[in-house]
C-alpha cells in the first residue's frame, strides 16, 4: 500500500459510519472526526449522537462538532491537525473554500450517485423514484460548489425492480468505502487525476420531506410504485382511509381502472387502488398504533374496513 496519511474524517449518518469503519482498518491515521452536533431523536426527543460520533468514540478518536466551519476559529482548529487529506461523507455542513484548501491533498467526498446525475441531499431515493436503471458511488475532489468537483473514481450497481431506498443505501454503503480507499491510494501516489463533470448532464436530488410522501392517486401507478419503494424505510409513503392515516410500505402494479384513490378490490393478494393511470396493489401497510404487516394478515381480521368502493386520501 502507498504511504500512510493523516486523515480528518467528516460525516454523520450510518452511510458515513461505514466509510469510517473501513478506514480504521487501513494503515492511515484518523487524526480527528467531524460530525453534526447531537440532535433530539425518538419519542422522548432525547439528544442522540450521530452514527459517526458513536463509532469514533468507540475507537477513542477525537470528535469535533462545530455548528459551522465558516469562522476563523474553527478553521484554525482544523489546520492545527496538519491533515494530509479530509474525507467527507454525508457530513451535512457546507465546506467553504478556505476549509477545502487546508489539507495538503485537499478534501474528497464519497457521494451516493453516478455524478453529475443526482447532485444534492437525497441521491439514493431520487434514483429509485425516477426509475433509474443504475446507481453507484462517485468519489470526487471537493470544490466550493454542491457536488460539482472533479470525479476521481466511480463504481456502479444496477437498480432492480425490487430495490427500495433502504436496500440501495445498504449496497452503496458497502461499495463506497472500497472506492474511497482506492482513491486515497491513487491520490497519495499521484496517479489519480479528476475528470471534470459535465454540468449539462447534472440533475439535483432535493432533500426528502414528509409532506411529499403523501400518495397522490391522480398520478400513474408506475410512478407511485417507485415512490413507495424509494421512500422505504423513510419517510414512508402514506395515505388515509376514513380519516385514519395509513402508511404504505409495499406495493406492486395491478390492473384495473376507476376514480383515482378508489378501492377496486381487497384480497389476500393486496388492496387494489385506482390511480390516474392503471392501478396499484398495496401489499404492506401500517395502521395507527400498529406495526407494518403484509396486507394478507390485515385482510384476515379487517376485511370490512377495506371494502371496495371507498376512496383513499380524502
Curated annotation (Swiss-Prot):
Gene Ontology biological-process entries: conversion of methionyl-tRNA to N-formyl-methionyl-tRNA
The Gene Ontology terms for molecular function here are:
methionyl-tRNA formyltransferase activity
Keyword terms of this UniProt record: Protein biosynthesis, Transferase
- Asked if the record carries the keyword Acetylation, the reply is no
Record EC number: 2.1.2.9
- Catalytic reaction(s) noted: L-methionyl-tRNA(fMet) + (6R)-10-formyltetrahydrofolate = N-formyl-L-methionyl-tRNA(fMet) + (6S)-5,6,7,8-tetrahydrofolate + H(+)
Check the record and name the Gene3D superfamilies matching this protein.
Formyl transferase, C-terminal domain (3.10.25.10), Formyl transferase, N-terminal domain (3.40.50.170)
InterPro entries from the xrefs? Answer: Fmt (IPR005794), Formyl_trans_C (IPR005793), Formyl_trans_C_sf (IPR037022), Formyl_transf_N (IPR002376), Formyl_transf_N_sf (IPR036477), Formyl_transferase-like_C_sf (IPR011034), GART_AS (IPR001555), Met-tRNA-FMT_C (IPR044135)
Gene Ontology CC entries for this record: cytosol
Q: Which Pfam families match?
A: Formyl_trans_C (PF02911), Formyl_trans_N (PF00551)
- Residues binding (6S)-5,6,7,8-tetrahydrofolate are 113-116
**What family name appears in the similarity comment?**
Belongs to the Fmt family.
Q: PANTHER family under this entry?
A: METHIONYL-TRNA FORMYLTRANSFERASE, METHIONYL-TRNA FORMYLTRANSFERASE, MITOCHONDRIAL
**Protein task:** Attaches a formyl group to the free amino group of methionyl-tRNA(fMet). The formyl group appears to play a dual role in the initiator identity of N-formylmethionyl-tRNA by promoting its recognition by IF2 and preventing the misappropriation of this tRNA by the elongation apparatus.
| Protein name according to UniProt | Methionyl-tRNA formyltransferase
The scientific name of the source species is Pseudomonas aeruginosa (strain ATCC 15692 / DSM 22644 / CIP 104116 / JCM 14847 / LMG 12228 / 1C / PRS 101 / PAO1)
Q: What is the lineage of its organism?
A: Bacteria, Pseudomonadati, Pseudomonadota, Gammaproteobacteria, Pseudomonadales
Amino acid at each position: 500500500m502507498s504511504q500512510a496519511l493523516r486523515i480528518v474524517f467528516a460525516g454523520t449518518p450510518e452511510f458515513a459510519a461505514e466509510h469510517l469503519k473501513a478506514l480504521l482498518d487501513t494503515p492511515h491515521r484518523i487524526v480527528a472526526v467531524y460530525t453534526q452536533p447531537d440532535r433530539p431523536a425518538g419519542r422522548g426527543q432525547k439528544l442522540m449522537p450521530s452514527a459517526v460520533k458513536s463509532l469514533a468514540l468507540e475507537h477513542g478518536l477525537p470528535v469535533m462538532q462545530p455548528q459551522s466551519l465558516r469562522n476563523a476559529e474553527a478553521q484554525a482548529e482544523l489546520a492545527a491537525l496538519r491533515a494530509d487529506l479530509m474525507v467527507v461523507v454525508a457530513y451535512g455542513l457546507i465546506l467553504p473554500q478556505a476549509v477545502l484548501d487546508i489539507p495538503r491533498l485537499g478534501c474528497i467526498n464519497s457521494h451516493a450517485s453516478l455524478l453529475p446525475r443526482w447532485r444534492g441531499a437525497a441521491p439514493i431515493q431520487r434514483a429509485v423514484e425516477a426509475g433509474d436503471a443504475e446507481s453507484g458511488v462517485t468519489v470526487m475532489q471537493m470544490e466550493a460548489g454542491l457536488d460539482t468537483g472533479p470525479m476521481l473514481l466511480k463504481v456502479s450497481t444496477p437498480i432492480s425492480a425490487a430495490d427500495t431506498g433502504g436496500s440501495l443505501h445498504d449496497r452503496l454503503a458497502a461499495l463506497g468505502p472500497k472506492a474511497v480507499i482506492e482513491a486515497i491510494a491513487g491520490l497519495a501516489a499521484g496517479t489519480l487525476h479528476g475528470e471534470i463533470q459535465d454540468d449539462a448532464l447534472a440533475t439535483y436530488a432535493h432533500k426528502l420531506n414528509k409532506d411529499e410522501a403523501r400518495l397522490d392517486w391522480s398520478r400513474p401507478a408506475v410512478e407511485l410504485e417507485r415512490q413507495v419503494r424509494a421512500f422505504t424505510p423513510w419517510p414512508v409513503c402514506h395515505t388515509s382511509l376514513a380519516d385514519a392515516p395509513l402508511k404504505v410500505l409495499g406495493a406492486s402494479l395491478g390492473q384495473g381502472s376507476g376514480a383515482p384513490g378508489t378501492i377496486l378490490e381487497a384480497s389476500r393478494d393486496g388492496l387494489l387502488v385506482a390511480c390516474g393511470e392503471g392501478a396499484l396493489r398495496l401489499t404492506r401497510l401500517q395502521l395507527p398504533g400498529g406495526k407494518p404487516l403484509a396486507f394478507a394478515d390485515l385482510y384476515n381480521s379487517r376485511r370490512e374496513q377495506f371494502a371496495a368502493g371507498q376512496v383513499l386520501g380524502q
